[in-house]
Design a protein with these regions (language model features):
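Mature extracytoplasmic domains of secretory-pathway proteins
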Residues: 51, 56-103
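Short, surface-exposed binding/anchoring microloops in extracellular/periplasmic proteins
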Residues: 32-63
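C-terminal region of N-terminal signal peptides and the immediate post-cleavage residues
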Residues: 21-36
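N-terminal secretory signal peptides that target proteins for export/translocation
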Residues: 1-6
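Short, charged, intrinsically disordered terminal tails
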Residues: 33-35, 130-136
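Bacterial N-terminal signal peptides
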Residues: 11-22
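Extracytosolic low-complexity repeat regions of secreted or lipid-anchored proteins
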Residues: 83-133
Length: 136
């Protein structure tokens, strides 16, 4: 009886360890981009969390709009709010413009293709609107 319990303990311990490592190992943060695609990141920044409107072109080149835009992340040092749209697309010829209206006094938009900043605009004033259009 003691031998059976000892064997079960010796068997269960390594199996449990392997299963715990498999279950609790970190997952990949994001899947790898498909070959021939570009990762597009559009970032909106404001001094207010809740803002007016945002307009951008999606992965298929369709114009998208959103009103009452909430920004989810606040930078601890600058106290500015920001949010990013991230998608992949194949065609570099699709439009890549963005527009953002703040309810505060600062509006900023940035467009990144892969890791290259292709457009940015910062406007200050009363309910400013920033416009991003890639430089050619």
């Amino acid at each position: 009886m003691v031998r059976i319990l000892y064997f079960r303990l010796l068997f269960t311990l390594p199996v449990s360890t392997v299963l715990c490592l498999a279950v609790f190992s970190p997952a990949t943060a994001s899947p790898a981009d498909a070959p021939g695609t570009h990762r597009i990141t559009i970032t909106f920044t404001s001094d207010r969390q809740h803002n007016g409107a945002a307009v951008w072109f999606d992965a298929d080149g369709r114009l998208r709009t959103q009103t009452d835009v909430p920004l989810a992340h606040q930078d601890a040092q600058t106290k500015l709010w920001s949010a990013s749209l991230v998608y992949t697309r194949r065609s570099p010829s699709e439009p890549l413009d963005a527009l953002f209206q703040s309810t505060g006094s600062l509006s900023r938009c940035e467009i990144w293709v892969d890791s290259v900043l292709v457009a940015d605009d910062t406007v200050r004033g009363h309910h400013p609107t920033s416009t991003c259009r890639p430089r050619n």
